[in-house]
Swiss-Prot record:
This is Protease HtpX homolog. It comes from Campylobacter hominis (strain ATCC BAA-381 / DSM 21671 / CCUG 45161 / LMG 19568 / NCTC 13146 / CH001A). One of its GO terms (cellular component) is plasma membrane. Its cofactor is Zn(2+). Signal peptide: none annotated. It is an enzyme of class 3 (hydrolase). The gene is htpX. PANTHER family: PROTEASE HTPX.
């Protein structure tokens, strides 16, 4: 079922890419966008995880270099009945975490140094249980594919702005308004896609974490600390295109009506409320 969802997502994003390619370059733009979309689908499926990990300078660790962290991930992988994922630490002092990969057999979980310094061992386990739930539910591929396409859509939007401003011939000038509209709409379309993908899967992963650890309060405490920290600081190298992958939106501290309207995560208050309901039912 999750593979079907991923296929639908990749097809939908390719169609959006082709539509805006047509607005910018007519029939030739559609053809170019189609070829690029095919290449991006292939690239996203096999390499999106590596791209995201490289962007955040994630360092792979093992049981010798990070024994405690590795042991927690191994324990959760066994509980979730999934293969042991690769484990990475991001040299970043803002606490956060994400999972990536195309399937449970090729998964990776990454945490920042700041998260390891801020949270207790139980809270770290709650966060990692959340990420392992993403792995088990195949959310990781969908999130990685969406991140790559959102980045490409942002690039296409910049091309549209360039074409609208610097188009030299009469036809380009006549299409200038369409290009400007495309440049405005494309990032919004990318944000809506990320929002639709992320909000429901975060609730699902929170519930999965509670089920894996049998201690919802671990994740409740972790989310509260992470949210409080994120309100005052923003991650270095964080991009809006990959924000939906993190357990807490790295741009939580950015206060604007636009960012609130298109936020990629449900509110931490609502997530904690749902976890408290799960706790009471245990």
């Amino acid at each position: 079922m999750e593979q079907i969802k991923t296929f639908i997502l990749m097809t939908f994003l390719a169609l959006i890419f082709m539509f805006f390619g047509g607005l910018i370059g007519g029939e030739q733009g559609v053809i170019i966008a189609f070829v690029v979309a095919l290449g991006m689908n292939f690239f996203s499926y096999f390499f999106s995880d590596k791209l995201v990990l490289k962007h955040y300078h994630a360092v792979k660790v093992d049981e010798n270099s990070a024994g405690g962290l590795y042991a927690i991930v191994r324990r959760l992988a066994n509980a979730a009945n999934v293969p042991m994922p690769s484990v990475y630490i991001i040299p970043e002092q803002i606490p956060n975490a994400f999972a990536t990969g195309r399937n449970p057999n090729n998964a990776a979980v990454a945490v920042t140094e700041g998260l390891l310094n801020l949270l207790s061992e139980n809270e770290i386990e709650g966060v990692l249980a959340h990420e392992m739930s993403h792995v088990r539910h195949y959310d990781i591929l969908i999130g990685s594919v969406a991140a790559v396409f959102a980045g490409a859509i942002a690039i296409l939007a910049n091309f549209a702005k360039f074409g609208a401003v610097f188009g030299g011939n009469e036809n380009n000038r006549q299409n200038g308004i369409l290009m400007i509209v495309a440049a405005i709409i494309m990032p919004i379309a990318a944000a809506i896609i990320q929002m639709a993908i992320s909000r429901s899967r975060e609730y699902k992963a929170d519930a999965g974490a509670a089920n894996l650890t049998k201690h919802p309060e671990w994740l409740i405490s972790a989310l509260s600390k992470l949210e409080n920290y994120a309100q005052n600081r923003t991650m270095q190298n964080a991009t809006p295109q990959s924000a939906h992958m993190f357990i807490i939106n790295p741009f939580s501290g950015v206060k604007s009506s636009f960012s609130q309207l298109f936020r990629t995560h449900p509110s931490t208050k609502d997530r904690i409320a749902r976890l408290n309901e799960i706790k009471q039912s245990m």
